[in-house]
Amino acid sequence: GLGDVYKRQVNRFLGYQSKAKGAVDKQVYALWNILQKRKFRYSSVSNTSLSSNVVFSQRVRTFDDALESSQINCVDGSVLFASLLRAINIDPILVRTPGHMFVGYYTDNSHTDKNFLETTMIGDVDLDDFFPDEQLDSTMVGKSQNEMSLLTFEKSKQYANKKYKENEEGIHSGKLNYMFLEISKDVRRKIQPIGK
């Protein structure tokens, strides 16, 4: 199960204890890399990774389900990643916009800075779908698995941070189909994982 994934890794994680610049991002990338090595694929009802009509009635699968099937959608992926962040004492944020969900995290203890991630990019994706102008797929030739993992992590941040900025007003408006949920330790206690 998922426990083993980060029991092995968790000793390396310090949450916000390290004052080194970028320390939190490095830890988040380590999680990203672990999940990528487990060959996550992205699943969406409509088979397009950027579909605006992803239905939110999909049952959020339990983590072991998601890990075993390696099929993940934006809701599963965001909730899974948020739980992993919480487990290593980094404060996650779940963000919802109409038809989509992504995850964020505070890069420091005082919550002055945050980054966001497009978790669907953990899987086998065509980066050209996300960045049509950059022809990224051609830059991937000959890159190692770790180089690719880092590239998709950085691109995922770039993409989600942009989406956050574009939708910031809505996200904080409390309007239907928008959400900004900080998952503090207290919230985590209230959220019961959905059983099988």
Regions found by a protein language model. Name each.
Residues L151-K196:
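Low-complexity, Gly/Ser/Thr/Pro-rich intrinsically disordered linker/tail segments
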Residues V75-E168:
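Hydrophobic/aromatic-rich core segments of domains that either
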Residues G1-Y6:
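Short, small-residue-biased leader/transition segments that mark boundaries at the very start
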Residues Q9, I34, A66, T139, ...:
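Residues that form generic nucleotide/phosphate-binding pockets
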